[in-house]
Amino acid sequence: MSSSGAKGGRGKAKSTKSVSRSQKAGLQFPVGRIARFLKAGKYAERVGAGAPVYLAAVLEYLAAEVLELAGNAARDNKKNRIVPRHIQLAVRNDEELSKLLGAVTIANGGVLPNIHQVLLPKKSGKDKGEIGSASQEF
């Protein structure tokens, strides 16, 4: 048996293209870069093989969630481009994201429109007979 380039079935064939860990995991975020940051950051003495993959997946999910909501906010405002205001509206109107990013300030995000209930005019029209909405039937 003469196999070209292989030694008894071991090793990779020479024409095999390298596949990144992000591609293996089906992610867009860079697993290798996150692994490098985890090692350089001295968060722990050693970093497991699955930790950067898991962290990349979590970060990708959070980014996709925020972008989805910000895109909806931009579309509601009839805009094609997501600006920091749309991200602010998306994060603050979502209960879980607002809790997660509660202490985060988004630059140029503005504030949520909110008028306190005490400052709103009282609806006293129903107590007294409403003149404008009276029925036309006799």
Swiss-Prot record:
Q: Which family does it belong to?
A: Belongs to the histone H2A family.
Keywords noted in UniProt: Chromosome, DNA-binding, Nucleosome core, Nucleus, Phosphoprotein
Q: Where is this region: Disordered?
A: 1-24
Q: Mind naming one GO cellular-component term on file for this protein?
A: nucleus
General function of this protein: Variant histone H2A which replaces conventional H2A in a subset of nucleosomes. Nucleosomes wrap and compact DNA into chromatin, limiting DNA accessibility to the cellular machineries which require DNA as a template. Histones thereby play a central role in transcription regulation, DNA repair, DNA replication and chromosomal stability. DNA accessibility is regulated via a complex set of post-translational modifications of histones, also called histone code, and nucleosome remodeling.
| Record PTM text | Phosphorylated on Ser-135 (to form gamma-H2AX) in response to DNA double strand breaks (DSBs) generated by exogenous genotoxic agents and by stalled replication forks, and may also occur during meiotic recombination events. Phosphorylation can extend up to several thousand nucleosomes from the actual site of the DSB and may mark the surrounding chromatin for recruitment of proteins required for DNA damage signaling and repair. Widespread phosphorylation may also serve to amplify the damage signal or aid repair of persistent lesions.
Residues modified as Phosphoserine are: S135
Q: Which GO terms describe its molecular function?
A: DNA binding; protein heterodimerization activity; structural constituent of chromatin
Work out whether the entry's keyword set contains Phosphoprotein: yes
- Entry remark concerning the domains of this protein: The [ST]-Q motif constitutes a recognition sequence for kinases from the PI3/PI4-kinase family.
Kindly list the places in or outside the cell where this protein is found, as annotated in its UniProt entry: Nucleus; Chromosome
Pfam families given in the database record: Histone (PF00125), Histone_H2A_C (PF16211)
Protein name per its UniProtKB record: Histone H2AX
In which tissues or organs does this protein occur?
Expressed preferentially in meristematic tissues.
Cite the record's note on assembly.
Answer: The nucleosome is a histone octamer containing two molecules each of H2A, H2B, H3 and H4 assembled in one H3-H4 heterotetramer and two H2A-H2B heterodimers. The octamer wraps approximately 147 bp of DNA. Interacts with numerous proteins required for DNA damage signaling and repair when phosphorylated on Ser-135.
Q: Which PROSITE patterns match?
A: HISTONE_H2A
Segments carrying motif [ST]-Q motif:
135-136
Where the protein is mainly located, per its record? nucleus
